[in-house]
Amino acid sequence: MSLLQIAEPNQSAQPHKHRFGLGIDLGTTRSLVAVVRSGKAQVLPAKDSTDTLLPSVVYYPATGMPLVGHKALAHLPNDPQNTIISAKRFMGRSQTDIKFSHPYELSGRREDMPTFVTAQGEVSPVAVSACIL
Protein backbone atom coordinates (compact mmCIF):
# COMPACT_ATOMS: atom_id res chain seq x y z
CA MET A 1 0.00 0.00 0.00
CA SER A 2 1.25 3.50 -0.70
CA LEU A 3 0.01 6.97 0.10
CA LEU A 4 -0.15 9.67 -2.55
CA GLN A 5 0.50 13.24 -1.43
CA ILE A 6 -1.49 15.91 -3.26
CA ALA A 7 -0.80 19.62 -2.74
CA GLU A 8 -2.36 22.76 -4.22
CA PRO A 9 -0.18 24.92 -6.49
CA ASN A 10 2.13 27.27 -4.57
CA GLN A 11 1.74 25.20 -1.39
CA SER A 12 4.48 23.30 0.36
CA ALA A 13 5.43 20.00 -1.21
CA GLN A 14 6.26 18.73 2.28
CA PRO A 15 3.96 15.94 3.38
CA HIS A 16 1.15 17.08 5.61
CA LYS A 17 1.50 16.18 9.27
CA HIS A 18 -1.66 14.10 9.43
CA ARG A 19 -1.70 11.57 6.62
CA PHE A 20 -4.35 8.89 6.77
CA GLY A 21 -4.71 5.55 5.00
CA LEU A 22 -7.08 2.63 5.44
CA GLY A 23 -6.57 -1.03 4.59
CA ILE A 24 -9.03 -3.92 4.67
CA ASP A 25 -7.97 -7.57 4.63
CA LEU A 26 -10.94 -9.76 3.77
CA GLY A 27 -9.45 -13.11 4.65
CA THR A 28 -10.83 -16.56 3.98
CA THR A 29 -11.04 -17.36 7.71
CA ARG A 30 -10.40 -14.01 9.43
CA SER A 31 -10.64 -10.35 8.42
CA LEU A 32 -9.23 -7.11 9.78
CA VAL A 33 -9.11 -3.36 9.23
CA ALA A 34 -6.04 -1.19 9.79
CA VAL A 35 -5.35 2.53 9.53
CA VAL A 36 -2.14 4.42 8.97
CA ARG A 37 -2.03 7.77 10.74
CA SER A 38 1.04 9.95 10.37
CA GLY A 39 3.09 6.97 9.27
CA LYS A 40 2.03 4.60 12.09
CA ALA A 41 -0.13 1.55 11.40
CA GLN A 42 -2.83 0.49 13.85
CA VAL A 43 -5.14 -2.52 13.53
CA LEU A 44 -8.65 -1.57 14.63
CA PRO A 45 -10.73 -3.79 16.91
CA ALA A 46 -13.86 -5.37 15.48
CA LYS A 47 -17.19 -3.74 16.35
CA ASP A 48 -18.32 -4.59 19.90
CA SER A 49 -15.02 -6.38 20.60
CA THR A 50 -11.44 -5.85 21.66
CA ASP A 51 -10.27 -8.52 19.22
CA THR A 52 -8.62 -7.19 16.05
CA LEU A 53 -9.29 -10.34 14.03
CA LEU A 54 -12.90 -10.88 13.00
CA PRO A 55 -13.89 -14.40 11.96
CA SER A 56 -15.04 -14.27 8.30
CA VAL A 57 -18.35 -15.92 9.20
CA VAL A 58 -21.96 -14.83 8.63
CA TYR A 59 -25.02 -16.47 10.21
CA TYR A 60 -28.41 -16.07 8.52
CA PRO A 61 -31.20 -16.69 11.07
CA ALA A 62 -34.77 -17.35 9.92
CA THR A 63 -35.75 -13.86 11.14
CA GLY A 64 -33.74 -10.78 11.95
CA MET A 65 -30.47 -9.38 10.71
CA PRO A 66 -27.50 -11.58 9.81
CA LEU A 67 -24.85 -11.96 12.52
CA VAL A 68 -21.15 -11.54 11.72
CA GLY A 69 -17.90 -12.66 13.32
CA HIS A 70 -17.78 -14.28 16.76
CA LYS A 71 -21.58 -14.02 17.18
CA ALA A 72 -22.05 -15.90 13.90
CA LEU A 73 -19.37 -18.47 14.71
CA ALA A 74 -21.29 -19.47 17.85
CA HIS A 75 -24.10 -20.83 15.61
CA LEU A 76 -21.84 -23.07 13.51
CA PRO A 77 -22.15 -26.28 15.61
CA ASN A 78 -25.96 -26.22 15.70
CA ASP A 79 -26.83 -24.63 12.34
CA PRO A 80 -24.03 -25.13 9.78
CA GLN A 81 -26.43 -24.76 6.82
CA ASN A 82 -27.12 -21.12 7.75
CA THR A 83 -23.63 -20.28 9.05
CA ILE A 84 -21.45 -19.43 6.07
CA ILE A 85 -17.69 -19.75 6.58
CA SER A 86 -14.92 -19.35 4.00
CA ALA A 87 -17.24 -17.78 1.40
CA LYS A 88 -14.17 -16.58 -0.51
CA ARG A 89 -13.48 -20.18 -1.54
CA PHE A 90 -16.67 -20.09 -3.60
CA MET A 91 -16.00 -16.75 -5.32
CA GLY A 92 -15.13 -16.92 -8.98
CA ARG A 93 -15.85 -20.65 -9.18
CA SER A 94 -18.66 -22.53 -10.79
CA GLN A 95 -20.40 -25.36 -8.97
CA THR A 96 -18.52 -27.72 -11.29
CA ASP A 97 -15.19 -26.28 -10.01
CA ILE A 98 -16.05 -26.83 -6.34
CA LYS A 99 -14.43 -30.13 -5.37
CA PHE A 100 -14.05 -29.56 -1.61
CA SER A 101 -16.44 -30.74 1.10
CA HIS A 102 -18.91 -28.23 2.58
CA PRO A 103 -22.21 -28.39 4.51
CA TYR A 104 -24.15 -26.00 2.25
CA GLU A 105 -27.06 -26.43 -0.10
CA LEU A 106 -26.03 -24.59 -3.26
CA SER A 107 -28.28 -23.16 -5.92
CA GLY A 108 -27.78 -21.91 -9.46
CA ARG A 109 -26.59 -23.34 -12.74
CA ARG A 110 -23.66 -25.77 -12.54
CA GLU A 111 -21.52 -23.52 -14.75
CA ASP A 112 -22.15 -20.34 -12.70
CA MET A 113 -20.94 -19.17 -9.31
CA PRO A 114 -23.30 -20.77 -6.78
CA THR A 115 -25.51 -19.13 -4.21
CA PHE A 116 -25.98 -20.45 -0.67
CA VAL A 117 -29.53 -21.49 0.25
CA THR A 118 -30.16 -20.10 3.75
CA ALA A 119 -33.13 -19.49 6.04
CA GLN A 120 -33.21 -15.95 4.59
CA GLY A 121 -33.14 -17.11 0.98
CA GLU A 122 -30.34 -17.40 -1.55
CA VAL A 123 -27.15 -15.48 -0.80
CA SER A 124 -24.14 -15.11 -3.11
CA PRO A 125 -20.54 -15.42 -1.88
CA VAL A 126 -20.13 -11.73 -2.77
CA ALA A 127 -23.09 -10.79 -0.54
CA VAL A 128 -21.63 -12.84 2.34
CA SER A 129 -18.34 -10.97 1.95
CA ALA A 130 -20.20 -7.65 1.90
CA CYS A 131 -21.78 -8.49 5.28
CA ILE A 132 -18.33 -9.07 6.74
CA LEU A 133 -17.12 -5.72 5.44
Q: Where do the protein language model's features map onto the residues?
A:
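N-terminal phosphate-binding loop and flanking beta/alpha elements of the actin-like ATPase fold
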Residues: 1-55, 60-133
